[in-house]
Amino acid sequence: CAKKRNWCGKNEDCCCPMKCIYAWYNQQGSCQSTITGLFKKC
């Protein structure tokens, strides 16, 4: 999993849900699959 400083792209399909949550919290990205990523196997 990438470090939380490496933000997800706005439409990136994330395998690191927490990375997306940090990015969203800091208004640096808005992954569409943040929630589904929690249950996704990469």
Swiss-Prot record:
Entry annotated with the keyword Disulfide bond: yes
Keywords: Disulfide bond, Ion channel impairing toxin, Knottin, Neurotoxin, Secreted, Toxin, Voltage-gated sodium channel impairing toxin
Pfam family for this entry, one: Atracotoxin
Top-rank taxon: Eukaryota
GO MF terms held by the record: sodium channel inhibitor activity; toxin activity
Keyword Metal-binding set for record: no
Disulphide bond pairs: 1-15, 8-20, 14-31, 16-42
GO cellular component term of the entry, any: extracellular region
Tissue occurrence: Expressed by the venom gland.
Major localisation: secreted
Subcellular location: Secreted
Entry similarity comment: Belongs to the neurotoxin 06 (delta-actx) family.
Record function comment: Inhibits tetrodotoxin-sensitive sodium channels by binding to site 3. It slows the inactivation, causes a prolongation of action potential duration resulting in repetitive firing in autonomic and motor nerve fibers. Does not depolarize the resting potential. Does not affect tetrodotoxin-resistant sodium channels. This lethal neurotoxin is active on both insect and mammalian voltage-gated sodium channels (Nav).
Comment block on domains: The presence of a 'disulfide through disulfide knot' structurally defines this protein as a knottin.
Protein name: Delta-hexatoxin-Iw1a
Organism field: Illawarra wisharti
